[in-house]
Amino acid sequence: MSSKVIVTIFGASGDLAKRKLYPSLFRLYKSGNLSEHFAVIGTARRPWSKEYFESVVVESILDLADSTEQAQEFASHFYYQSHDVNDTEHYIALRQLQAELNEKYQAEHNKLFFLSMAPQFFGTIAKHLKSENIVDGKGFERLIVEKPFGTDYETASKLNEDLLAAFDEEQIYRIDHYLGKEMIQSIFAVRFANMIFENVWNREHIDNVQITFAERLGVEERGGYYDQSGALRDMVQNHTLQLLSLLAMDKPASFTKDEIRAEKIKVFKNLYHPTEEELKEQFIRGQYRSGKIDGMKYISYRSEPNVDPESTTETFASGAFFVDSDRFRGVPFFFRTGKRLTEKGTHVNIVFKQMDSIFGEPLAPNILTIYIQPTEGFSLSLNGKQVGEEFNLAPSSLDYRTDATATGASPDPYEKLIYDVLNNNSTNFSHWDEVSASWKLIDRIEDLWAHNGVPLHDYKSGSMGPQASFDLLEKFGAKWTWQPDIAYREQGRLE
């Protein structure tokens, strides 16, 4: 059903709006989820006219449109207001424009606000939306906020208090675009629609879980931002722990947003908080140095533009989380995330316990691999007999990958997540209880790294991280399942 809504984007002149938001809204328009009864108000400091704003929108969607006319018709629903977030008069003008557009498009007073700006402005915007009666209780009112949601628990808590002054928790959608990816959402199907997995998804059968977020790129033009953030804040506090919660949660009573969210929150509340000694042993940080991949030379992190030449910011983080629940108590959830690694890829490996062998040789563990990006799908490794006269065992794989055609047809994560907001589905968004629990744990690791002399390990560009990350798994009698660097070295592609 087509949504009736006035969308207001704060930060409408920014890169995110042009690259992600306008194309995602256009796809929803093409699919009929937005049609006649919607309008978009773009606000930013730049003094744009409506006509110029429309041209920016058209340019951002032209390659998706069936015709220029279709793109222009979509863009005609867009309106622009030059806006200073600190100026009360601008909110009065915004309220008047919203009222006019609500009447023109018969939007039934439904309002969606998207804060595509730096978090320090969130509180100011929320306060003015409430004080100037733009948030007035008529129709639905929903707020989407981008990451990062704070830089630690203290700043995140203050940010949350500011938003709660104008919106209720159920109206706030903290977006994490990874949760919009097709295979992330398919984890529910893999787990809860297949008896062979759900019955063994526990500590009696699973030895360890491995989560890898690997990037081949370095920090590129984001050196200034990244040097103040690092891998732990940038990737672990949100993406990694959100994915962990989907893997570790108990089966919800029903497939509804409230039941799913309740089970996810239990995981966050059950995250084990290690002792200081355990933190030192179980969490690794690293920073890339120069290297050569496929004949291309790459500089070290400290040589990147806008990076402190003596920076101790980590570009790689690895460790072991534990969930103190009946289902997974004692099972390590290993993670690693880093820049300038061998290959881009997000993989989850569920490593099952080894069986006692009657064949006179140890058996390879069964491993369920979930491929999230760049390919999507899953595989299951099994032990089977090799063809031939002798009875020799070898692992083989049941493999399903979504082909390029199907992958291209799947919704963009932002499209899927905006669709969910319009339909009041908060399943794939972070509740404050999840955010607060994750920051409390991440803050402990950050504090240790900042004040206790924990080593910052070097790793060569093109590797899969420092040796310490591999040594960590060995302490648990495990090893990383995905090691693309081995093949690269054998092929002479790494130096």
Features from the language model and the residues they span:
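Secretory/organelle targeting and membrane-embedding segments
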Residues: 1-145, 149-495
